[in-house]
Amino acid sequence: MIIPAIDLIDGQVVRLFQGDYAKKTEFSLDPKNQLLSYQQDGAALLHLVDLTGAKDPDKRQTKLIEEIAASLSTPLQVGGGIRSAADVDALLNAGVARVVIGSLAVKSPEVVLRLFDKYGGDAICLALDVNIDADGNKMVAVHGWQQGGGKSLESLVDTFMPAGLKHALVTDISRDGTMTGANTALYCELAERFNEVQWQASGGVATLDDVKAVKTSGASGIIIGKALLTGVFSAKEAIACWPNV
């Protein structure tokens, strides 16, 4: 499945390079219209990251997100600085289909376990942003990749599997925004080890061949942001390579 994505800062569509706010590219696009165009191209799931909220939780773009979700018939998953159960409640009440939770799952797993119990596995997607060292250890980063979380990807998955984990978005930080190709070996490994989880791949997609490679890796879907925004290929072309299941 192709999952078109946009990142928002103060209502503006942007892309960051490897999570760095100082390395920002702005796009003169209306976020609602952009997601509607992806919907019209056939996307079955859309992804939005609230980078303003990620940086300052008091400035979350919840009202804009609610307006965007209301304009779409396609499910919208939203992440970016989810720091509490109240943040999750607010987004789901705003019409978001699924909330993407990263740092909170690392730092306060008991809070997220209660959210799984309250909302079920389809309403929550874990965001596991990993730095992979020379020995292949996959350590999860937190707070917009500014800090190490001190936990491995595998240990976090093991924590949440009994609670009903169904969806996980994994980004190889070294590939994000680089358009150097996705880390297909990572997704092959995860899909084989944790085949109950629907893995969403993210980071590095530059060509339709990259899309095809991830399709065969065992991942259930791929998040594509920059390649669509810069016109390398269209959402329609990507979906033709990897039709919705």
Curated annotation (Swiss-Prot):
Localization (cell): Cytoplasm
Q: Which GO terms describe its molecular function?
A: 1-(5-phosphoribosyl)-5-[(5-phosphoribosylamino)methylideneamino]imidazole-4-carboxamide isomerase activity
Family indicated by similarity: Belongs to the HisA/HisF family.
Active site (catalytic residues): 7 (proton acceptor), 129 (proton donor)
Query: Record keywords: Cytoplasm included?
Result: yes
Q: What is this protein called?
A: 1-(5-phosphoribosyl)-5-[(5-phosphoribosylamino)methylideneamino] imidazole-4-carboxamide isomerase
Keywords from the named record: Amino-acid biosynthesis, Cytoplasm, Histidine biosynthesis, Isomerase
Among the GO biological process terms of this entry, one is:
L-histidine biosynthetic process
Q: What class of enzyme is it?
A: isomerase
Supply the EC number(s). Answer: 5.3.1.16
- Entry-linked Gene3D superfamilies: Aldolase class I (3.20.20.70)
For this protein, the record's Pfam families field holds: His_biosynth
Q: Write out the GO cellular component annotations.
A: cytoplasm
Q: In which pathway does it act?
A: Amino-acid biosynthesis; L-histidine biosynthesis; L-histidine from 5-phospho-alpha-D-ribose 1-diphosphate: step 4/9
The record, for PANTHER family, names: 1-(5-PHOSPHORIBOSYL)-5-[(5-PHOSPHORIBOSYLAMINO)METHYLIDENEAMINO] IMIDAZOLE-4-CARBOXAMIDE ISOMERASE
